[in-house]
Amino acid sequence: NVTFRNNTLNRIITRGLLLTIRGRAVVENNHFMSNSMSGILLSDDAKSWYESGACRDVLIKDNVFDYCGEVPILIKPENRVNGGCVHKNVRIIGNTFKKYSGEVMNIKCSENIEITDNIFEQSSEIKQTDCKNVVIK
């Protein structure tokens, strides 16, 4: 299990946080600011770097995403053909998304996703590909 809480990630030349863990992960009360890529990436890299696996229980709560160079929350396993959902049980709750005109989340091959009580200062676009049981409130 991992808890990542009360941090500021500012001007990182890659993604702010690469998260791949089968246990419980809590990402709470962080500020992702001016990172070159996504603020948070959930990957499942079985194609190139082989450095990560599927996530099974993730809470992303009360964070601020302030101008990330790419989509702030990217949930994207590196599969080319959908062979079923990879990431499961992801809750994205009470976050603030600033300065975005495009997608604020891009979610692929995932199930049991809850997106609730987030603040979108500009765009609230959420892209979903091959997902099951996604709830947006």
Locate the predicted segments by residue.
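Long amphipathic alpha-helical scaffold regions
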Residues: N29-C68, Q122-K137
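Short "repeat-start/strand-capping" segments in structured domains, especially the N-termini
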Residues: V2-T3, I21-V26, R56-L59, K88-N89, ...
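Generic long, charged, amphipathic alpha-helical segments
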Residues: P72, V86-R91
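Beta-propeller domains
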Residues: N1-V26, S34-S36
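Extended beta-solenoid/beta-helix repeat architectures
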Residues: V86, K99-S101, C109-K137
